[in-house]
Amino acid sequence: MTDILRRIEAYKRGEIAAAKVRIPLAELKARIAEQSPPRGFRAALGAHREKGDFGLIAEIKKASPSKGLIRPDFDPPELAKAYAAGGAACLSVLTDAPSFQGAPEFLTKAREACPLPALRKDFMFDTYQVFEARAWGADCILLIMASLADDDARRLEEAAFALGMDVLVEVHDAEEMDRALRLSSPLVGINNRNLRTFEVDLAVSERLATMVSSDHLLVGESGVFTHEDCRRLEKSGITTFLVGESLMRKDDVEAATRALLTGSANILAAE
């Protein structure tokens, strides 16, 4: 685990402990009982793949540790509507506050504003967070293999499945991919960003994709800025992408989303 992930785990553990006191698990379960069923995150991505279309997990992210505020006029419901109108298959919403200025209500309001399934994008360490995610309306959780032992990842995955949710398992290298493939989820995200150096290289996805059979659905994460980037990864069997910052910075988010997916206009230059 990198120093960055250790620091994040330390503050997340503190957040989790405080949340368990503030909102007991029984209360979360009661809120979940009032939720409509999960929308089917993996199914939405699979439907795009079956039609031969690119599948986009469009991210709603207010800020990042390295670049600060990303979008001054940050409006999660309007962004969700724009992504949906532009052809996105799913949403990814940051809920981590210390590093990304995220919040639970961003997820809840974005999901309420459109028909797309939503991922809780956060650092998951405790099954309590899985119940939180479902109570907030999430349809999928993220497991970052670089921050989790195998037993912890399996326990989090099982908790999500029990709630009818999907699981996106994120990897960056061959060792993490090997571990991810021992889990049950067929959704595997390849992060092209090195968390130690922050360098981004699409070759990471191209290299790791060779380890995966066709029964898995691969997601290219980070470094996808243009339709040409999508076409490049398509050659390695990756037709689903998680993209956020480059879309969030555009004045016309709907048009930028459409351009990324279809190449309809050259308006999505790399940031």
UniProtKB/Swiss-Prot annotation:
Q: Which InterPro entries match?
A: Aldolase_TIM, Indole-3-glycerol_P_synth, Indole-3-glycerol_P_synth_dom, Indole-3-GlycerolPSynthase_CS, RibuloseP-bd_barrel
For the protein in the UniProt heading, the enzyme class is lyase
Which GO molecular-function terms appear in the entry? indole-3-glycerol-phosphate synthase activity; phosphoribosylanthranilate isomerase activity
Pathway participation: Amino-acid biosynthesis; L-tryptophan biosynthesis; L-tryptophan from chorismate: step 4/5
Describe the reaction catalysed, as an equation: 1-(2-carboxyphenylamino)-1-deoxy-D-ribulose 5-phosphate + H(+) = (1S,2R)-1-C-(indol-3-yl)glycerol 3-phosphate + CO2 + H2O
Task: Provide this UniProt record's keywords sorted from A to Z.
Answer: Amino-acid biosynthesis, Aromatic amino acid biosynthesis, Decarboxylase, Lyase, Tryptophan biosynthesis
Q: Which family does it belong to?
A: Belongs to the TrpC family.
UniProt name for this protein:
Indole-3-glycerol phosphate synthase
